[in-house]
């Protein structure tokens, strides 16, 4: 691919975002247990990075070693840069864990007891716990010609044990493997009277390493070390060749745990020859090995804040607000009839969305409900409401995206339950994931003495997931606007039926009109600038990668358009480059909540067009997904979106990171006045 304009590398951008997440763990303004949580989040993000992005890069290197990445670098060069940066990030994680977080936790009476410091009473308690709770479920595997190296599951905790001596059959023991079942707790609370601390804990790895000899009787344990293998987690389902996507996925899901190895994690003290054996057995190189100065899976430390009753070391809980127009009304339909409703999560509650669906399920005047589901969780009151509606005789149609990564099994289960109660379940369009967030309710109403059907719609930037609605920032719109409702109806027609593209009045839809409409809007701002008029673009999203949109932004900036981009994660556009992008700023907001809404603002000669969307500016969202962008037409609500979703974050000087012209980020520091957008919005809505 020839590159006309510069692009920053995607993989390095993802690692850069995780560096910003990890920086939260070093921020003294963040409560201590939340700082630990940010370390765990970084670890979880890295797991997914290796399972998906690094796995894909390694596949590309094998299949087409001479290819270039979209930024123009060779794949080998990208791989080398990614490995170097990932190694540094992992080292920084463990340094921060030991030098900053664990030290501070001990000062607060929260302590991890290492085996080297156990006294006699603690050792006896640990021994009893091992024999009572662990030994019955552990299966040691001795390695010999009859017991080859096991194919360990993706991201499972394992121990490699060096042994000396002969077993009961006279075999010379060399090495064994112990796999820790996922059901075993990774953190075990030590009784306070033994610990000496209000909250004392022992890691599962400490217990296993101390007593692993009990699994190999009469043999000498020379070493015992943790290891963990990360595997390629992409599912290989050829949608063109299968007749039933759900059945095909159910057959493919178990293989995810046994994909090609991508990364080996070992404890820092693992002997070199043991590491070599693990790499050889996994088919990995030295560069694919990451040394952990602590637990190899930091994600499991996420349990600690829930196990410790110390509210002073956590974020102050917030109670999302209920908008007055909703709180003061019995019927959600009456509320929407009086005007559009805008919800700003997590500052405002997700409950009105659920209440709308619950009322629709029970309302005898409701005849049909249509809903998209991408992620909703394993215990979803929203799905219960849909099933209740189907039982009550409503025409319920649910577009369930079975290929939502890492939620496939959950969505398959929901699809089965929905079908069992009589709902129509479809899986979208082959080759295009349904990522749009839409709910459509059709209801009989009386107008002028006549009965007619009226549509009500909810559109959102985030998932129909009550739990993440308390953790992610998103906007949702409830409306009975005739044109928007008709557009949503047409999109559902395309998802459930077969036919030509239907013309939409208000919505921009991928894979048809979203990309060209966006390009058209950017070009219109450029024309305003060339004519000497005010021109402005402000856009907020999770990721910006699509090359043609980036090229349009560069050209608009050169025409004089002032462009402010708020991109939480990876951004391939390079701001502040002389002669190219001096008029563009890029900032990333990393704070208590995960920034998730997508907002597109165009000054448009003073008309101020504002769109909300489920779509990031990426190839997949424009061309390989079903997405919608919807306008905010109500003037009051438009001012809210601009103020709460854009201006507040442009003024943030506590959680904002500004991208420099070389692609690196620098944290914005408060001057005389400190401004934190998320905390300000919490104060506004939740005080």
Curated annotation (Swiss-Prot):
This is Polyphosphate kinase. ATP binds at residues 45, 472, 568, 596. Mg(2+) binds at residues 375, 405. The keyword Metal-binding applies. Pfam families: PP_kinase, PP_kinase_C, PP_kinase_C_1, PP_kinase_N. Belongs to the polyphosphate kinase 1 (PPK1) family. It comes from the Bacteria. It catalyses: [phosphate](n) + ATP = [phosphate](n+1) + ADP. Its cofactor is Mg(2+). One of its GO terms (molecular function) is metal ion binding. The active site is at residue 435. CDD domains: PLDc_PaPPK1_C1_like, PLDc_PaPPK1_C2_like. Catalyzes the reversible transfer of the terminal phosphate of ATP to form a long-chain polyphosphate (polyP). Keywords: ATP-binding, Kinase, Magnesium, Metal-binding, Nucleotide-binding, Phosphoprotein, Transferase. Gene3D superfamilies: Endonuclease Chain A (3.30.870.10), Polyphosphate kinase middle domain (3.30.1840.10), Polyphosphate kinase N-terminal domain (1.20.58.310). GO terms for cellular component: polyphosphate kinase complex. An intermediate of this reaction is the autophosphorylated ppk in which a phosphate is covalently linked to a histidine residue through a N-P bond. GO terms for biological process: polyphosphate biosynthetic process. It is an enzyme of class 2 (transferase). Its EC number is 2.7.4.1. PANTHER family: POLYPHOSPHATE KINASE.
